[in-house]
């Protein structure tokens, strides 16, 4: 029978911890970008043309903030998937301990 086990117990536990931290961090960043936090303006990909040549500069900046927040939420979802994979690996490692060879 083919085993889906590809990680050891320590690597799987590390994957869970990193996934939980990544989800928390990225969701908080996504929320802060979504409310247009001024502290995070350095991380918004805008050019001088977006600020000075655009007839409605705040709308363009708000769209850029929201795009970055969506990217953070997508990355958090990917971390959730990887955390689920790590959790499955932990369960498979536990089951392997009880199997008789």
From Swiss-Prot:
Q: Name one GO cellular component term.
A: membrane
The molecular function terms of the Gene Ontology recorded here are: RNA endonuclease activity
Topology of the protein relative to the lipid bilayer: Multi-pass membrane protein
Key words, A-Z: Endonuclease, Hydrolase, Membrane, Nuclease, Transmembrane, Transmembrane helix
Keyword Transmembrane in the entry? The reply is yes
**Functional summary from the UniProt entry:** Endoribonuclease which preferentially cleaves ApU and ApG phosphodiester bonds.
Stated name of the protein: Ribonuclease kappa-B
Origin species, per record, is Xenopus laevis
């Amino acid at each position: 029978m083919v085993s889906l086990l590809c990680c050891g117990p320590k690597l799987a536990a590390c994957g869970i911890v990193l996934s939980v931290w990544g989800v928390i961090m990225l969701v908080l960043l996504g929320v802060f970008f979504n409310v247009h936090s001024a502290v995070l303006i350095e991380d918004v990909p805008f050019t001088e043309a977006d600020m000075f040549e655009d007839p409605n500069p705040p709308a363009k900046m708000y769209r850029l903030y929201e795009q970055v927040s969506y990217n953070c939420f997508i990355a958090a979802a990917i971390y959730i998937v990887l955390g689920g994979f790590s959790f499955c690996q932990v369960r498979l490692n536990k089951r392997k301990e009880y199997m008789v060879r």
